[in-house]
Amino acid sequence: MITGIQITKAANDDLLNSFWLLDSEKDEARCIVAKAGFAEDEVVAVSKLGDIEYREVPVEVKPEVRVEGGQHLNVNVLRRETLEDAVKHPEKYPQLTIRVSGYAVRFNSLTPEQQRDVIARTFTESL
């Protein structure tokens, strides 16, 4: 559980009036702000704070969502010949829908250049 605190009494003057997030499960403290001696976002063992007195401060904890350098995969289950035929004879494929950048799109609504690009990107000889 995460608890927000403001240190009101400490042997270390750098800790006085500083704000921290205490993680009781990990027995760690994350510095939110301190006058000196501790960097913002620095994580230390609670024992490193020493003998302190504090008051709790309200903290709203939201689930953390991080996306860093994620991958995206579009899956189109069809044959190259089907798409090539759809370029030549669009009237035969009015409902042909593919995935492009996470969106479903009718193949015939794409420009000829976009259609060629989809075919080239979807069907490669090797990775």
UniProtKB/Swiss-Prot annotation:
It comes from the Bacteria. GO terms for molecular function: formate C-acetyltransferase activity. The modification Glycine radical is found at residue 102. The keyword Acetylation applies. InterPro entries: Auton_GlycylRad_Cofactor (IPR050244), Form_AcTrfase_GR_CS (IPR019777), Gly_radical (IPR001150), Glycyl_radical_cofactor_GrcA (IPR011140). Pfam families: Gly_radical. Residues 5-127 form the Glycine radical domain. Keywords: Acetylation, Organic radical. The modification N6-acetyllysine is found at residues 48, 88, 92. Disulfide bonds: none annotated. One of its GO terms (cellular component) is cytosol. Gene3D superfamilies: 3.20.70.20. Acts as a radical domain for damaged PFL and possibly other radical proteins. PANTHER family: FORMATE ACETYLTRANSFERASE, FORMATE ACETYLTRANSFERASE 1. This is Autonomous glycyl radical cofactor. It comes from Shigella dysenteriae serotype 1 (strain Sd197). The gene is grcA.
